[in-house]
Design a protein with these regions (language model features):
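Hydrophobic faces of well-ordered beta-strands that scaffold small-molecule active sites
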Residues: 18-22, 45-47, 74-77, 96-97, ...
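Conserved N-terminal beta1-alpha1 strand-loop-helix module at the mouth
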Residues: 1-83, 87-91, 180, 200-222
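Glycine-rich phosphate-binding active-site loops on the catalytic face of alpha/beta enzymes
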Residues: 43, 95-105, 139-146, 182-202
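Generic hydrophobic/aromatic pocket-lining and core-packing "Φ" positions
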Residues: 34, 58, 85, 106, ...
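Histidine/lysine/aspartate-rich catalytic loop segments that bind and position anionic ligands
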Residues: 95, 99-145
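Short, ordered loop/turn segments at secondary-structure junctions
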Residues: 49-50, 79, 100-102, 121-122, ...
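Glycine-enriched alpha-helix->loop->beta-strand junction motifs that scaffold or abut catalytic
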Residues: 38-43, 68, 89-96, 111-117, ...
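Catalytic cores of alpha/beta
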Residues: 81-91, 124-132, 169-186
């Protein structure tokens, strides 16, 4: 069961402005990535369900976060149907992120008051997502649309909360473009969850980059 309601999760997204995301099939490695993000100040993490045994890894991460990382809100991404969403919510997912807009996922999440953020690529899709109860819309792939698309949407729909994923990097220039355009938060994957030259995760770098990105975002919000 979720530890946080959709309104609580939405508020943390608005307050912190950053949702790190990644997938790895190794539980211990994934714990270290999660800890690095947490130590860097992140209070949300989207574990993308993109590989075999993702549910097993996510369950272990959620238990670890509850026991060792107070205030860390675990969610799951790359969910493509209601059955998977229900399964992850039973394993403690506090939010569900999807690459597409699906009404069946909206229904199961709303029934449990769990935040869901569907991937949308047009104002029509965004409007439909909001009609279905979406608090924060995922703009995906963000790099295709860019800050100008967000700015255009916020003109007629000032109430819309947007989280671009894809095309976001932890640099001041990139984040400034997004937040000045009016995004609520950003999802950040490989540009933040860094690896060294040997292909292994660089946990110190992940922690430092998370901290720096959080500081940039807070400066832009204030």
């Amino acid at each position: 069961m979720a530890q946080y309601s959709r309104l609580e999760v939405a508020q943390v997204m608005k307050d912190t402005g950053l949702v790190p995301l990644f997938f790895n099939s190794d539980i211990e490695v994934s714990k270290k990535v999660l800890k690095a993000c947490y130590d860097g100040g992140a209070r949300l993490l989207e574990f993308t369900a993109r590989g075999d045994f993702a549910l097993e890894v996510f369950t272990a991460l959620t238990k670890y976060a509850i026991a060792e990382l107070p205030g860390m809100i675990m969610g799951v991404g790359s969910v493509t149907d209601a059955a998977a969403a229900s399964l992850y919510m039973q394993m403690g997912a506090n939010f569900i992120v999807t690459p597409v807009l699906r009404e069946d996922i909206a229904l199961v999440c709303n029934r449990r008051k769990v935040l869901w953020s569907p991937g949308c690529g047009s104002l029509t899709e965004i409007a439909r997502a909001e009609e279905l109860g979406c608090e924060i819309v995922k703009l995906f792939p963000g790099g295709i649309y860019g800050p100008d698309f967000v700015k255009a949407i916020k003109g007629p729909c000032q109430w819309t909360s947007i989280m671009p994923t894809g095309g976001v990097s932890p640099t001041k220039e990139n984040l400034e473009g997004w937040f000045n355009a009016g995004v609520t938060c950003v999802g950040m994957g490989s540009k933040l969850i860094a690896k060294d030259n040997s292909g292994n995760y660089d946990y110190n770098k992940i922690e430092n980059m998370t901290r720096e990105a959080m500081q940039i975002i807070q400066d832009l919000k204030n």
